[in-house]
Amino acid sequence: VDLSTPRRKRRLAAETNEAVMSTYVRQFLCLKDNYGVLVHDSATGATASIDAPDGEAVIAAADAAGWTLTDALVTHHHADHVQGLPALRARYPKLSVSAPAKEAARIGGVDRPLSEGDYARVGRLAAKVIETPGHTAGHIVYWFEEEEIAFVGDTLFALGCGRVFETPPAVMWGSLLKLASLPGSTEVYCGHEYTEANARFALTIEPDNAVLKARAGEIATLRAAGKPTLPTTIAAELATNPFLRAEEPTLQAAIGMPGADPAAAFAEIRGRKDRF
């Protein structure tokens, strides 16, 4: 899927002049249901791969766009997000790999270990690092604030969230709250195309959510046509994603937990999804 049109334009003020630059995002499916994503800064020519699920697919996408990869921004250590790194390093010897500091040893070959509040740079673009433990203990998200884009790996999915493998559910809930606090207009790119299955589950939690029902129909139409359901937005997820709505009274009533601690409600929903 080629989304390599300008996603956002911003102005950088210098002392005596202004430069207008565009950020380009190219998203493509690889492996079974992973998304590869390239971020390109046209002002400098810098290009980053968000994770590296399939090195050859990433290289092919970069070649098709006429871009040279300069960076890899890794969200977490799982194999389907890092197994392409050796191929990328072989093709691009000057590649700089950024990754969670807490998982750098496990990933290997990390040039820039990153923690909460650090910045990853792609040319003149700057992504603030948000630590989102839960799916893995060191998972991070890259938030390009000025471009209003977040690359969330496997922490948040459209209508879903990642399985909680390495922390208690309450920790994952805290991570989701961080993402929920981003501006509603933020475009969200996730690691997988899971949306249609997530919609089926979400409707078992909130069958009377009219916005969710309408969105599920739109998703079915997109997938039937072989089109992606991503990016999503924070606003869309707050309205329809049961995992972000665990503190909503209507959702808590729907799962039989009125007035519950939101972290407990989240854990209940996550457990139901694991068994779905």
What are these regions (language model features)?
Residues 21-69, 141-153:
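Conserved beta-strand hairpin/beta-sheet module of binuclear metal-dependent hydrolase folds
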Residues 39, 51, 76, 132-135, ...:
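Divalent metal-coordination and catalytic microenvironments
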Residues 7-20:
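Short, Lys/Arg-enriched N-terminal segments with co-localized hydrophobic residues
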Residues 177-187, 196-276:
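Accessory terminal helices/loops
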Residues 38, 119-145, 149, 181:
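Core dinuclear metal-dependent hydrolase active-site scaffold
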Residues 52-53, 77, 102-103, 135-136, ...:
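Active-site metal-binding loops of divalent metal-dependent hydrolases
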Residues 47, 54-131, 148:
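Active-site HxH/HxHxD metal-binding segment of metal-dependent hydrolases
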Residues 160-186:
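Active-site-adjacent loop/tail segments of enzyme domains
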